[in-house]
Amino acid sequence: MTPHEPASIFKRIAALFYDCLLLIAVFFVITAVAVRVNGGEAIESPLYLMALIPVAWIFFAWFWINGGQTLGMRAWKIKLVNESGDAISVRSSVTRFAVGLVFFPFVLLPALFDNDKRGLHDKLAGTKILRLKQY
């Protein structure tokens, strides 16, 4: 196996599941602080939920830009790179996240029919997820 083989859809979904568990923990901490600031009252505004979207992007983008691997991706030994095999840009991270968010859960459907197993968000962002060599 070379380090340039595309990662399987199963590994991508498993890594996303791990990352979502971590992101939920981050949301819990932010919400606990926000409720405290709000005098102990629940925050019922949909604007609060919308404010969590940039938090999610920062969570994913930081890992994607700095090393190409979220914690879930590290666990499943997969890595996000641009089409040249280098680290992705901030612009690519915005595109990838936004398309993934808007078209979830259908974003991976193109990967079922693509030789490089690239989802819609990867195609539009110019990124790909590789399976890393295991030692």
Residue ranges and their predicted role:
Residues 1-135:
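Membrane-interfacial and juxtamembrane segments of integral membrane proteins
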